[in-house]
Amino acid sequence: MAKRISVKLVKSTIGQKQPVCSTIRSLGLKKLNSTVEHDANPAVLGMVKRVAHLVEVKELN
């Protein structure tokens, strides 16, 4: 079974560049404090790394 991660948007995207906002939307995050779960594959981990200053990541068991 693949590892899963939980991604929570903790800071607003107001004032951020368009690629950062697009990455947040691609992860499935819309509003502040919204949370989504993803498989921890290289594509998702790369997106999370790009917006690490706006999100909080937890590894799920």
From Swiss-Prot:
PANTHER family: LARGE RIBOSOMAL SUBUNIT PROTEIN UL30M, MITOCHONDRIAL RIBOSOMAL PROTEIN L30. One of its GO terms (cellular component) is cytosolic large ribosomal subunit. Pfam families: Ribosomal_L30 (PF00327). PROSITE patterns: RIBOSOMAL_L30. SUPFAM superfamilies: Ribosomal protein L30p/L7e. HAMAP family: Ribosomal_uL30_B. This is Large ribosomal subunit protein uL30. The keyword Ribosomal protein applies. The gene is rpmD. Signal peptide: none annotated. GO terms for biological process: translation. Part of the 50S ribosomal subunit. Keywords: Ribonucleoprotein, Ribosomal protein. One of its GO terms (molecular function) is structural constituent of ribosome. Belongs to the universal ribosomal protein uL30 family.
